[in-house]
Structures are given as structure tokens and as C-alpha cells.
Amino acid sequence: MVNQLEMLYEGKAKKIYATDKEDMVIVHYKDDATAFNGEKKAQIESKGVLNNEITSLIFEMLNKEGIKTHFVEKLNDRDQLCKKVEIVPLEVIVRNVAAGSMAKRLGLEEGYELKTTVFELSYKDDSLGDPLINDYHAVGIGATTFEELNKIYEITAKVNEILKEAFKKQNINLIDFKLEFGRYNGEILLADEISPDTCRFWDATTGEKMDKDRFRRDMGNVINGYREVLNRLRN
């Protein structure tokens, strides 16, 4: 049993709290929804509850598959106990199908099947709009090392294969998603969350979107999409 102490950090969708165990934190999932680097904001009732449950199920699955993550256990509807990591200030964006900003940037039709999975790297800085960078930028600015980045890409590739297969069984296409990583006792761990906030999930039969694009694009029924992802994961 751990006890929650002071808040260490508040992000767009989560709060991080210290605990009486120095190497553990409590991650609290909020109902806040944001898009376009915080320009669009709303409260969506139960979003935090659903994202906590979805992320917990996915991290439990990844842990069983040998992927080392920061996740320890789900504590309640909104809270997880996680290892306290030093976040690598990078996001790895994994694209299996062209959609969103990549489709727009490269003039591709949304839904275009990429010839190979594409990894993109962005520098985590809201004031700069999380700009896309390459490996040399990442190492050059001191965000990581080539050795660490190779490890991150190795984990990313494994996670992509595991998740694609898992969601395929639930008739969901994993279009793209973003991952974050942290350092813990000299190791690289998968961190943050994996949820409809951070992934594009399309129904494999109808193409219906079941993710944050429903909020970004004012499609309505945002929470129904999240709930559908959770219901299928539970099967």
C-alpha cells in the first residue's frame, strides 16, 4: 500500500503525484480533452476513467509479453501506480497507415497503406508545438544518445507488432500511435499511456473512428468510441 503525497506535475490529461515510496508515483487520469497543442479544450465525462482502464489493460498485456513498462498496477477508476521514471523528452510516432498530420503534410489520402511502418520523432516542447526532428537532432540537442534511441526503436517495433495483432483480433485497425519512454535504474521503460487519446483506432469493417479524432474533428459521440475500444479489449 502506498500513500499519495504532493502533486509533482500536471499535464493536459494527467496529474502525477509523489508517494511515500521514493521510486513510485501515482498517475491520475483527468477528463480534460485537448487538441491542436491545447488550442481546443473540453471536459468529457468519464474519459479519464476509460483511458485509465484501457491503458492498464494494454500495459498489463505488454508486461506479460516481456516489454518493460513503468506500469505497476491500477489502483482505482482514475489512478495507476507507476515507477518514477525520468522522461526522455521525445515522442515516437508510429504510423502504419497515413492519417492526420502525416497525410496532410505529404499530400497522401487518409487511409493510404504505407509500404513500411514509419517512425517519426518529435521533441516534447509545447511552446514549440512538439516539432518533428530526426535522430541526429535528438542526439545533438542532448535529448538522448544513439544507443538509447536504438533501444527505443527496438521496443517501439515490438510494441507495434504486439498491439497490431491484439487489436486485429478485436476487428480494430491500429492506424498510428505515439509512445513515450523513461529512464529507470539505467533501463529504458515504456511510459505515459496508450489509449484513444494517443492512438488512432479504426473499425476494420466500417472504418469508423474510435479515438480522439472524434473530438478533434467535432464528430460527436467521443466517449462512445472510447467505450467501444474498451469493450472490445475486454473480450
From Swiss-Prot:
Associated pathway: Purine metabolism; IMP biosynthesis via de novo pathway; 5-amino-1-(5-phospho-D-ribosyl)imidazole-4-carboxamide from 5-amino-1-(5-phospho-D-ribosyl)imidazole-4-carboxylate: step 1/2
Keyword Transmembrane helix on entry: no
GO terms classed as biological process: 'de novo' IMP biosynthetic process; cobalamin biosynthetic process
InterPro entries linked to this entry: SAICAR_synt/ADE2_N, SAICAR_synt_PurC, SAICAR_synth, SAICAR_synthetase, SAICAR_synthetase_CS
One GO molecular-function entry: phosphoribosylaminoimidazolesuccinocarboxamide synthase activity
Keyword Nucleotide-binding: yes
Protein family: Belongs to the SAICAR synthetase family.
HAMAP family on file: SAICAR_synth (MF_00137)
This protein's name: Phosphoribosylaminoimidazole-succinocarboxamide synthase
Organism: Clostridium perfringens (strain ATCC 13124 / DSM 756 / JCM 1290 / NCIMB 6125 / NCTC 8237 / Type A)
